[in-house]
UniProtKB/Swiss-Prot annotation:
<dbReference type="GO" id="GO:0000049">
    <property type="term" value="F:tRNA binding"/>
</dbReference>
<dbReference type="GO" id="GO:0003735">
    <property type="term" value="F:structural constituent of ribosome"/>
</dbReference>
<dbReference type="GO" id="GO:0022625">
    <property type="term" value="C:cytosolic large ribosomal subunit"/>
</dbReference>
<dbReference type="GO" id="GO:0019843">
    <property type="term" value="F:rRNA binding"/>
</dbReference>
<dbReference type="GO" id="GO:0006412">
    <property type="term" value="P:translation"/>
</dbReference>
<keyword id="KW-0689">Ribosomal protein</keyword>
<dbReference type="InterPro" id="IPR000114">
    <property type="entry name" value="Ribosomal_uL16_bact-type"/>
</dbReference>
<dbReference type="InterPro" id="IPR020798">
    <property type="entry name" value="Ribosomal_uL16_CS"/>
</dbReference>
<keyword id="KW-0820">tRNA-binding</keyword>
<dbReference type="Pfam" id="PF00252">
    <property type="entry name" value="Ribosomal_L16"/>
</dbReference>
<dbReference type="InterPro" id="IPR016180">
    <property type="entry name" value="Ribosomal_uL16_dom"/>
</dbReference>
<dbReference type="InterPro" id="IPR047873">
    <property type="entry name" value="Ribosomal_uL16"/>
</dbReference>
<protein>
    <recommendedName>
        <fullName>Large ribosomal subunit protein uL16</fullName>
    </recommendedName>
</protein>
<comment type="subunit">
    <text>Part of the 50S ribosomal subunit.</text>
</comment>
<keyword id="KW-0699">rRNA-binding</keyword>
<dbReference type="InterPro" id="IPR036920">
    <property type="entry name" value="Ribosomal_uL16_sf"/>
</dbReference>
<comment type="function">
    <text>Binds 23S rRNA and is also seen to make contacts with the A and possibly P site tRNAs.</text>
</comment>
Amino acid sequence: MLVPKRVKHRREFRGKMRGEAKGGKEVSFGEYGLQATTSSWITNRQIEAARIAMTRYMKRGGKVWIKIFPHKSYTAKAIGVRMGSGKGAPEGWVSPVKRGKVMFEIAGVSEEVAREAFRLAGHKLPVKVKFVKREAE
């Protein structure tokens, strides 16, 4: 499970998810990528579920790069607690993903295998995704 080793502040503001991703919009490490077409928070468990779905389908072939990291904490109050009396306890870790961001990359497999692996991974994620290829230099 991906979690930060240490953070400066345990509780963060939620922030806004406006616009497109500033960087990381091209395939840079592998041959094929999985790009987000909508914006959302992606939890560390969703990232891990997508990674497992891809690697199991590829059967130890190829290499996978995870280009997002859950560095933002999110909080929640316990069930049945009244409003007020401070911010809730940290509940988990998320990665804010804006549209256009390439989240995963694959190399060393055929295009058909990569497409199917990304299709399976896309079902585990809360964003709409599309398959992208590396631009020819």
